[in-house]
Amino acid sequence: VGKVIGRFDPTPSRTPEECERHYTQVHVRMAQDLLRPMPSLLSYYTDRAVAQADVNGGWKQRPRAWRFVVLRFTPGSTLAFTAEQNEMVAQDHVNCLYRLRSCDVEENVLLDRVDGQLALTKFMIEADRATGVDADGAWDVFRALADRVRGVMDGAFGARRLIVNRVLNEVECEPLDVEGQRPIGLLDDTTRVGYLEAYFDHRRWGEEALGVLAAGGALGDPALVGVNLLRIEERAPLDVTG
């Protein structure tokens, strides 16, 4: 399956409230209209960071992330907008977002106990590699972190699914009114390492199981920077997987 995970912040040229309003009421609807006719599209999910694990093992830290987008395609396919559609999307970024980091990823399902549930709570871990650390070395550390999470979830009440995503590349973006709004190609190199997506029946079970991973700064490693453990509000504007 082809998969893209994008990350972005609310543009500083608008208030956070206006960015949220425009993104949910305008941008997502536009994306639905553009993506729905694509025969290769499997799903389009929007993720909002609503909480972050803190050094006490609780969830009182203000999230260091705003929103993510997760797109899945049939094998061998990826996002395929026309030049005109790409420009329309980029121009709309001005109204709500910047610092876009869109990455093709390779996913590996480490745990899957989903069986008919219609509502789940999502958690995510993101990471970049530190200066001077090569991509393979950073990935080894991140994969070891994924194994730690798997170990926690194996015996955790309400744990349903764990996916580890290795970043393959990152889109290069140029500014319109501020940085990171118009995609123009691929970066020669990316510092983004990967994403972990963890699903539980309820936020309580996920917070109780995963919060301990951040206690005392235990998520830290010299090979990684920007390691954030987030609780996510996920929506599915499009899903044709059945």
Say what each PLM segment does.
Residues V1-G242:
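Macromolecular interaction modules
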